[in-house]
Amino acid sequence: MSKSTPLKSSIIRADLPEQAEGRTGPETGKDPEKTGNSEGKTDTPVIEIKDLCHRYPHLEANALDRINLRIYRGERVAVLGANGAGKSTLFKHLNGILRPLSGEVLVKGEKITKKNVRMCRGTVGIVFQDPDDQVLAPSVEEDVAFGPINMGLSREEVKMRVKEALEMVGLNGFEERAPHHLSGGQKKLVAIAGILAMRPEVIVLDEPTAGLDPLSSARVLKLITKMNRELGITLLLSTHDVDVVPYFAERVFVLHHGKLEASGSPEEIFNDPALLRKAHLRLPRVAEVFEMLKQEGVDVNIQITAETARDEILRVIRSENRKAEMK
């Protein structure tokens, strides 16, 4: 499907009663969790969430309310939502840090329980939003080695994994550095390296670009995309930054006040202004420029990345040149 084609009607709106687990949506007839690149997949999801609810003891309302979603091997998925939408709470269920009030989380078809939580954590690694919650050892090398050591690996294997992980994130030579002397972006890379060294099949990143300057943010996004493409790691990222999503995600889930509002490709999500308003989100900056051009009467299709924006601008210029030549 062309990126310039409006896709609003293809979005799966998860707040419709017809689209509860096991049913289909009224507009598309598709399973709501098999949109985008996962459509037509018959393999077992690497992560599956069924009717997940969670409530914190000090709150009356559910922090998560009947969440249903599936993540398939090799995907790059974004969970998009404003602050307080429930993204961090959702992610802490994915390897057993939090337990559901009701519903269940399955990893490779197995429900997370007290008995298998260690296995699940070997499959699903989590990078927390604040690296200071995760990077605690006196040196970078010790911090990255912590996970592999606790997996019972040999000293030689641990050393090899630490070396490979630091090379992957671009921090080779930082082994003896103290984490508290590093920048925020470097600490984030150390946290990612610590998870990489454990070689999980899935890495979950909670707001990985939060608090980073533009260059550090771009470096982290480039790294995690490389991890997906070169290592085949399934990636699940949460963010409130709408400008990040088009450059990372193949599929997007929109979370609002603990409820899954919609799922679809980035193009589909950002072609639904009503959904964005409801979820307290906005268009990516690139798309806002095209929206303003349309309001000025320019015949353009809204784009969401710099690359597709360039192509669309060139198309419009060539079209206008042809019209001028015909006069």
Swiss-Prot record:
Looking up InterPro entries in the UniProt record yields: AAA+_ATPase (IPR003593), ABC_transporter-like_ATP-bd (IPR003439), ABC_transporter-like_CS (IPR017871), ABC_transpr_CbiO/EcfA_su (IPR015856), Co_trans_ATP-bd (IPR005876), ECF_ABC_transporter_ATP-bd (IPR050095), P-loop_NTPase (IPR027417)
- Position of the signal peptide: none
Database matches in Pfam families? ABC_tran
PROSITE patterns reported in the protein's UniProt record: ABC_TRANSPORTER_1, ABC_TRANSPORTER_2
The topology of this chain with respect to the membrane is:
Peripheral membrane protein
GO terms for CC? ATP-binding cassette (ABC) transporter complex
The UniProt annotation puts the region (Disordered) at 1-44
Q: Which UniProt keywords apply?
A: ATP-binding, Cell membrane, Membrane, Nucleotide-binding, Translocase, Transport
What EC number is given for this enzyme?
7.-.-.-
In its UniProt record, a GO molecular function of this protein is: ATP hydrolysis activity
- What superkingdom does the record give? Archaea
Q: Where in the cell is it found?
A: Cell membrane
Ranges of biased composition (kind: Basic and acidic residues): 28-44
Query: Which segments constitute the ABC transporter domain?
Result: 47-282
Q: Which residues take part in binding ATP?
A: G81, A82, N83, G84, A85, G86, K87, S88
Q: Name one GO biological process term.
A: cobalt ion transport
Q: What is its main location?
A: membrane
Task: Name the family the entry cites.
Answer: Belongs to the ABC transporter superfamily.
Q: Which PANTHER family match?
A: ENERGY-COUPLING FACTOR TRANSPORTER ATP-BINDING PROTEIN ECFA1 (PTHR43553:SF24), HEAVY METAL TRANSPORTER (PTHR43553)
**Role:** Probably part of an ABC transporter complex. Responsible for energy coupling to the transport system.
Protein name (database record): Putative ABC transporter ATP-binding protein MM_0887
Species in which this protein is naturally found: Methanosarcina mazei (strain ATCC BAA-159 / DSM 3647 / Goe1 / Go1 / JCM 11833 / OCM 88) (Methanosarcina frisia)
